[in-house]
């Protein structure tokens, strides 16, 4: 079985939105680094759901490549 390296985004200094650092991998093992952000009020959503439509949650541009992408853990929250 092919091993997939974890995907880790770089921490981004908080501004209007709170950025979360995510680890995950794609089913086809293609590495993707994605920027994900949620409003501070909705931070609990990121912890509870892995199917959140980030494009609707975040006002700025969020890149969510495909539904096959699976988040393993939320490793950090920046407030």
From Swiss-Prot:
This is Uncharacterized 9.2 kDa protein in COXIII region. Its main location: mitochondrion. Keywords: Mitochondrion. It comes from the Eukaryota. It is found in: Mitochondrion. The lineage of its organism: Eukaryota, Viridiplantae, Streptophyta, Embryophyta, Tracheophyta. GO terms for cellular component: mitochondrion.
């Amino acid at each position: 079985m092919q091993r997939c390296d974890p995907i880790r985004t770089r921490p981004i200094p908080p501004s209007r939105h709170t950025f979360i650092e995510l680890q995950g991998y794609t089913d086809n093992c293609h590495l993707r680094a994605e920027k994900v952000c949620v409003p501070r009020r909705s931070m609990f959503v990121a912890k509870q759901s892995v199917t959140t439509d980030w494009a609707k949650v975040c006002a700025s541009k969020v890149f969510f490549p495909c539904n096959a992408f699976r988040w393993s853990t939320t490793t950090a929250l920046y407030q």
